[in-house]
Amino acid sequence: MTSKIIVALDFEKEAEALALVDQIDPSLCRLKVGKEMFTTLGINFVKQLHQRNFDVFLDLKYHDIPNTVARAVRSAADLGVWMVDLHASGGLRMMEDAKKILEPYGKDAPLLIAVTVLTSMEDLDLLQIGINASPMEQVLRLAHLTQRAGLDGVVCSPQEVEILRNACGEDFKLVTPGIRPIGTDFGDQRRVMTPTAAIRAGSDYLVIGRPITQADNPAEVLRSINVSIG
C-alpha cells in the first residue's frame, strides 16, 4: 500500500466512525486512531479496522518514564498497528528504550515516530511552558534527538518539512498534520498547508481529518487528494 494519506478518525461514536470507514478504500489511505477514540472504544475498534484491511496509526503520543513507554509500545506492536508515536520531549532514554523493545518484531515492528511540537502551538505557547525558542528551533532540536535515538521519523508541521528533510536526510519519515485542501476550514491547526505543497516540500505522510471525514462524499475527496499528489 503506497498511499501517503492518513485519515484521522475523530468521532464520538463507533457507528459513525465505521460508517465513514466503510465508504473509503484501504488501498487509498491509512487510518489514524487518537486518544479520544481509543479511550472510548479500545483495542476492539482497532481490530475492526484491521479486519477491513486498513493499516492503523495509533496516535497516543506516549510520554512517561522509559519502562512504561517501552511496554506500551510493545503492546501496540502486539496489536499489529502500522505506526505508533511518542513525545520526543520524554527524552533520549525513553525513546531508545521504546525502539529497543521493538527489535524482536523485526520487519513486523510498527514505525516508531516522535511528536516534536504540536501543530496548535506558537511562540507564546512554548514560552508559557518555559521554552524560549521558536517552534522551528524546538522542532529541529527534538528531531535531531529523535534521530539519535534511532526512531523512524517525526510528526511535524508542513512548514518545517523542508528544513527537516535537509537536516535529517531522505530516510527519516516526516508525518504532517495541518493538511487542508484549498477551500477548507483551518480548524484548530495553526500551521497548515495544502496536500500538494506538503508533498512538494518533502512530506512522507499527510494526516487529513475533517476535510475527508466531514465531506458529503468522503470517497471522492480522498480520490481527488490522491490524484492531486500523484
From Swiss-Prot:
Its EC number is 4.1.1.23. SUPFAM superfamilies: Ribulose-phoshate binding barrel. Substrate binds at residues 10, 32, 59-68, 119, 180, 189, 209-210. It holds the Pfam family OMPdecase. Keywords: Decarboxylase, Lyase, Pyrimidine biosynthesis. SMART domains: OMPdecase (SM00934). InterPro entries: Aldolase_TIM, OMPdecase, OMPdecase_AS, OMPdecase_bac, OMPdeCOase_dom, RibuloseP-bd_barrel. It catalyses: orotidine 5'-phosphate + H(+) = UMP + CO2. One of its GO terms (molecular function) is orotidine-5'-phosphate decarboxylase activity. GO terms for cellular component: cytosol. Pathway: Pyrimidine metabolism; UMP biosynthesis via de novo pathway; UMP from orotate: step 2/2. GO terms for biological process: 'de novo' pyrimidine nucleobase biosynthetic process; 'de novo' UMP biosynthetic process. The active site is at residue 61. Catalyzes the decarboxylation of orotidine 5'-monophosphate (OMP) to uridine 5'-monophosphate (UMP). Belongs to the OMP decarboxylase family. Type 1 subfamily. HAMAP family: OMPdecase_type1_B. Homodimer. This is Orotidine 5'-phosphate decarboxylase. It comes from Haemophilus influenzae (strain ATCC 51907 / DSM 11121 / KW20 / Rd). The lineage of its organism: Bacteria, Pseudomonadati, Pseudomonadota, Gammaproteobacteria, Pasteurellales. The gene is pyrF.
